[in-house]
Amino acid sequence: MTKHKNLVFIFSDQQRYDTLACYGNDWIKTPNLNSLSEESFVMERAYVGQPVCTPARGTITTGLHPHNAGPTVNIIPLPEEQKTIAEYLPNEYKTAWFGKWHLGDDGNAQHGFQHWISTEDHASRFVGLSTEPSKSDWHNYLVDQGYTPDSTLSNDQPHLPEDVKNQTPDNWEVFSAHKRS
């Protein structure tokens, strides 16, 4: 098996660049993000393709502008035929999505992601049954177990791929999408 770089994408709602120490902030304490930035690639000139949630996620996962990816506003699913980075990666990669999806049915693995844990269920909104999002079974399970939904990536979670949990050298790509608290 060819060794490739492991990829981790972290989405957080309403995250401004100037709230992180790696960009000069010295009063908001984010020790884990600081540590990650010290051992990772930190972008100096990154731009969001669209400031709205769904189109921004579509842009990041596909590499396309919103008008090319499909979702141009919230509550528009990513077209089934639209490929994401998970579908372009070599087969050696293990791919995972954890957290908010907002690009269609949150309940099922799709677009090349092999491991899938969603904290929300927007399917009823996408098919017009409701205007309010509901919480996924996974979200409700986390709450019942005493976790907050944003703890889906903690090391003690049983559904994490073993390669991520044990930090083995296999090739993996993880998207972690967190909600605003």
Please give the residue ranges for each predicted region.
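Formylglycine-dependent sulfatase
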Residues: 1-181
